[in-house]
Amino acid sequence: MARPPAAAPVLRAEPEPPRVEPAPQPAQPTAQPSEAPTTTSVSLQNPPGSTKAEKIAWLARQAERCEECRGLGTLRDTMVFSVGNPEATLMFVGEAPGFEEERQREPFVGPAGQLLTKIIQTMGLRRPEDIYISNIVKFRPLEGDARHQGTRNRKPSPIEMAAAVKYVLAEISVIQPKAIVALGATAAEGLLNLSGSVSAMRGRFHDLNGIPVMVTYHPSYLLRAEGDGPVRAKAEKRKVWEDMLKVMERLGLPISERQQKFFA
């Protein structure tokens, strides 16, 4: 097994320094014809930077001031971008930040995130060193009066997803992971334009521009299943684990006999 990529710092949005306009230059006495220089257009699909980390940091700054997202009036103010190693071969994508994610400005740090971390560790990987985690929407969806929303969360609407999905697609273009795990139906819809139940989409790989995508249940679904008793909770966890075994196999990760039998 290849040595996991080196750890990268948690990526957070940084405000851009104020733009300084250059001083006007005196006109030249004569204009000599010359060939126009060739320049590369800077865009979300072609972010500036010499490393993946620099490109991701630039994307985070663009997401911070996303006028299309903020202009909806249905999202809260705090931008939560991503966490993990830009050199990772495995990427997880969820739907949107919740209360804890907004408070800590990091995706998947609440109860569902803690369960995701356990899944990652059970795969024999480390968070954040070996993986990269992001969301379809970078702002927590607003529910009622923002001042009294408290811990209440909701899934993003199709309009909110359409405004924000360009950022996670740009991240994928930079990271170029060898596999993506779409956590829940919202992530599947945003990445793959698929609708329907996760049960109908999971268990097999889908294609996103040549990158295999495994759709599986969101960790919050597994937490809700625990309320239905241990038998159902174990059965649903086994389904997710079977999906992760397929991902591990695709990535060439070692799978022990003990790992094969988890939740069986």
Q: Where in the sequence are the language-model features?
A:
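A polyanion-binding, active-site-adjacent surface
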Residues: 1-264
